[in-house]
Amino acid sequence: MRTPLTLLALLALPLHAAEAPATLLAQADKELLSDGLTSEAKAADWKVAKGKWVRTAEGIKVEELPADNHGAAGRLNQKLGDFIIAFDFRLDGAKSISLSINDAKEHMARVLITPAAFRIQRDDHDHDGPDKAVVFLNQAEKFAAGSWHHVVLEMVGDTMVTTIDGKNSGWGRDELFKTEKANPGLTCAGQSATFRNFSLWSAKAEP
């Protein structure tokens, strides 16, 4: 029996395919990963280093554990070129959350969100050395507990752009961003926050 080509095409699609996010800098190319982060969703290969992570019907609830002496952190073992990441978050008492991007050895960049502000930065890339973090944007913005918000991070070439809820955007540029990126991660300081609808796309610059 022959299988129709249309069926084969559908079977080749990733599970839980997400809609390509709206962007300012890049065009979404190929979907690399989609994880609803709920108890019903097919889980991506997250590596939890710190904290408590529990999948619920609403999303993955994340808490910092006092015994860890470190914020909750979970990462994907994923090498990245130019990319787009989109996800939703809800603060449920957390002091802060972040989306963090590394290279093979060190932190590279992050989007940090508190109940009162969000920050976009290139991270300190050598810890005890001369390098220092560079803050591209530190904007006052209220994120009320219990309300959902949407984040899109684009990194293409030497530029990163972050947009929250389709209206608040900031960008920065650094030569470091041209190097291979890896291990995108979510973090949470305090108790607690919930994440859902995480998607990762390869990207190409707008023509």
Enumerate the language-model features and the residues they cover.
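Short carbohydrate-recognition loop motifs
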Residues: K52-H70
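Beta-strand-rich interaction surfaces with strong enrichment in secreted/lumenal proteins
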Residues: G71-Q78, L137-F143, P184-G185
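Secretory/extracellular carbohydrate-interaction modules
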Residues: L65-D126
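Short tryptophan-centered beta-strand motifs in secreted/extracellular beta-sheet-rich domains
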Residues: L37, I85-F87, W148-T162
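Short, solvent-exposed beta-strand-to-loop segments that form ligand-recognition rims
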Residues: T163-N183
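Short, aromatic/His-centered strand-loop micro-motif at the edge of beta-sheets
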Residues: D128-H150
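Ligand-recognition surfaces built from glycine- and aromatic
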Residues: T179-P207
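Extracellular carbohydrate-recognition regions
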Residues: E19-V48, P207
